[in-house]
Amino acid sequence: MLILTLAGCGAGTAAPTQPEITPAPSAELTEEPLESTASAVTSEPVQTGLFAEQIFSGADGDIHYSYYLPDSYDGSRKFPMMVVMPGYNMMWFGEDSSGSNLNWSGFTAWTRLDTEMVVVSAQLTDWGEKSARQAIELTEYFINRFAVDASRVYAAGYSAGGETMSRTVAMRPDLYAAYLHGASQWDGSYAPIAENSVAIYIYMADGDEYYGSAKARSAYENLHEAYENAGWSDTDIDKVLRIETPDNAFFNEKGIYNYHGGANVVFDDPDNLNWVLSHSKG
């Protein structure tokens, strides 16, 4: 499953005003998904592609989400899943905001990889414990209802979405094999990550205007310490814990001068995404 997050914001802070980088969507929109998208093989054709602007009524209220099923999905075999959460600019603010995350590269990039996978992204209403519970509930809904390989469930969050997803993977580290933490601060705990061998990729511009890259380095150091405390060697930690903080020149060469939103380029390089997908449970 897939989870997306864009511009960040923390509790008690104003929302960032910079726009996110949003390449055109790659998946064809499919309306009114059929029940045959469930994991069981059926004699009826299974709809695939992009299912936009769905609503799931969960324990903490409605969850507005969209998802993508690869063309070969028919319920006969299980697929990896990415759950990705966008930033503040793409969260749920009512009907006018519905589907605003569908053009975001944090969602579409996973649908273009050679590895076919289910991709899920939600538009949540906050970036605290409620949103983390909703992300977990949505993840479990897809694991139980779709043909998902439970050993290859991944998470990603950008900015505000990263605040949510860092809580999510720490609350239920048993669910996720790896997590991409983009341009955000870490709001979750650390020990459960190491105790459950969750791989973490932290990416933030060194010149991030919103959070500041010191928060990325702090998260890395705390996670590294958690792995050390769990008995991991430095060599083994390097295989599951990764951080990148490109300098301003890296972004300027790409014509990017807004560094917080500019870190969305992490989704443009398949090597970054495939590092996440290289990990599995068990």
What is the predicted role of each segment?
Residues 203, 207-209, 228-282:
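C-terminal catalytic histidine-bearing segment of alpha/beta-hydrolase fold enzymes
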Residues 97-98, 212-229:
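Short alpha-helix in the alpha/beta-hydrolase fold that links the catalytic acid
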